[in-house]
Amino acid sequence: MAIELDLQLAVENEEGLPSEQDFQLWLDKTIPLFQPQAELTIRIVDEQESHELNHEYRGKDKPTNVLSFPFEVPPGMEMDLLGDLIICRQVVEKEAVEQNKPLLAHWAHMVVHGSLHLLGYDHIEDDEAEEMESLETEIMQGMGYEDPYIAEKE
């Protein structure tokens, strides 16, 4: 099975989005570093859905780039279901321009970042953030992309 992706495109305009193969590649280069098999959903949404979900689940009154919803496996059950990633197209596109990053690289970074959240990583505390950013950089560079945090380090 390896990494099984359910890609949902819930946007008005699908033109210019990464391909399903892109999303699969990014997952295949991330999740097997931590576990051999997984199932997850990536849902690409517009700003309205992102805003509603971010408000409902995080209390933030704005859209966000990526939301992660890890699946909590009931005790005593064996399942490979990791959870869901909700990625907002407009926020990703806007951030790529603001951060002067290639759009495809920023999409890849959002998938890597969200996947690490599903795997239990976080960036609330400084030491956690440092570990997570280091992993993201290593994974992104392993796929041939630049350090996604290079602008912050300069």
From Swiss-Prot:
- Top EC class of this enzyme: hydrolase
Print the keywords alphabetically.
Cytoplasm, Endonuclease, Hydrolase, Metal-binding, Nuclease, Ribosome biogenesis, rRNA processing, Zinc
Q: Which Gene3D superfamilies match?
A: Metalloproteases ('zincins'), catalytic domain (3.40.390.30)
Q: Primary place of residence?
A: cytoplasm
The residues forming the signal peptide are none
Write out the annotated subcellular location. Cytoplasm
Task: Output one GO MF annotation.
Answer: RNA endonuclease activity
Annotated coiled-coil segments of the chain: none
**Record note on cofactor:** Binds 1 zinc ion.
Q: Which domain of life is it from?
A: Bacteria
Binding-site list for Zn(2+): H113, H117, H123
Q: Got any disulfides in this one, which pairs?
A: none
Gene Ontology CC: cytoplasm
Alphabetized InterPro entries for the sequence:
MetalPrtase_cat_dom_sf_prd (IPR023091), YbeY (IPR002036), YbeY_CS (IPR020549)
Q: Which cofactor(s) does the record list?
A: Zn(2+)
The UniProt record lists the EC number as 3.1.-.-
In the record, biological process GO terms are: rRNA processing
Instruction: Give a short account of what the protein does.
Output: Single strand-specific metallo-endoribonuclease involved in late-stage 70S ribosome quality control and in maturation of the 3' terminus of the 16S rRNA.
Similarity-based family: Belongs to the endoribonuclease YbeY family.
Quote the protein name from its UniProt record. Endoribonuclease YbeY
**Protein source organism:** Vibrio campbellii (strain ATCC BAA-1116)
